[in-house]
Design a protein with these regions (language model features):
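Outer-membrane beta-barrel transmembrane domain signature
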Residues: 92, 110-222
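Transmembrane beta-strands of outer-membrane beta-barrel proteins
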Residues: 32, 39-43, 54, 66-70, ...
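Hydrophobic, lipid-facing positions within transmembrane beta-strands of outer-membrane proteins
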Residues: 36-40, 49-53, 63, 82-86, ...
């Protein structure tokens, strides 16, 4: 059961990774006024809570990339897991002169821990989560400084988790579809708050299939 929690929960780390590589198509700030953004993200599901922070660099259109570090805690397991996340995307108009953007891209999360005492030994968990997909979004101005940034996304996700104890190891894998959506609230030209929800389809039984997220992004001045 505990091993299943690890496999099902680490997919939430993908949210922290994607928050470190966001664009308008993902409900976040454009790189028009600043090429460097700092971000923080929180992701919650039935069995886990994950949070992290990182930085992104990119262009208004074209390539953008980022990295982050996150920490996860799990129900029923002592200790925390640390994850190193990265992502890469490409932003482009949905069609010529359209205000909508589409961004194909992917993320990779490497998880380390937690460790559990089992009998006279220590069981060490590790995980790898990868996503490949695309997102679509736009900016809707409300006032001179405030905009709403609605977005939707779809991605394929794959998680591999390993448990090692006394020289023996066991591995489990899971592949699934991630359907996401939400809206960023651009409160100032350099600050966005972004609530989101991600649903997993086709995952193994017992997997957390609903993940709630909240992220904040701040654009560094030139």
């Amino acid at each position: 059961m505990k091993f299943g929690i690890i496999v099902g929960a680490v997919s939430g780390l993908a949210l922290c990774a994607s928050a470190a590589t966001a664009q308008v198509c993902q409900g976040d700030l454009s790189f028009r006024s600043s090429r460097t953004h700092l971000g923080a993200a929180l992701a919650m599901s039935s069995n886990t809570t994950s949070f992290g922070g990182g930085a992104t660099v990119g262009h208004r259109q074209g390539l953008y990339a980022g990295g982050s570090v996150g920490v996860s805690s799990y129900n029923g397991l002592s200790g925390n897991a640390v994850a190193v996340n990265g992502g890469l995307g490409y932003s482009m108009p949905l069609q010529q002169k359209s205000s909508w953007q589409i961004c194909p891209g992917g993320t990779l999360s490497l998880g380390f821990g937690p460790s559990q005492t089992v009998g006279g030994g220590t069981m060490h968990f590790s995980s790898q989560t990868m996503t490949l997909g695309a997102s679509v979004g736009t900016a809707v101005p409300m006032t001179k400084t405030v905009s709403i940034l609605p977005f939707g996304s779809a991605a394929w996700g794959y998680t591999r988790a390993t448990a090692k104890l006394n020289g023996n190891s066991a591995t489990d894998t899971d592949g699934y579809l991630l359907i996401g959506g939400g809206a960023g609230f651009q409160l100032t030209p350099s600050l966005v708050l972004r609530p989101s929800i991600t649903l997993l389809a086709g995952a193994n039984p017992g997997t957390d299939n609903t993940i709630f997220g909240l992220s904040a992004t701040f654009a560094l001045p030139h």
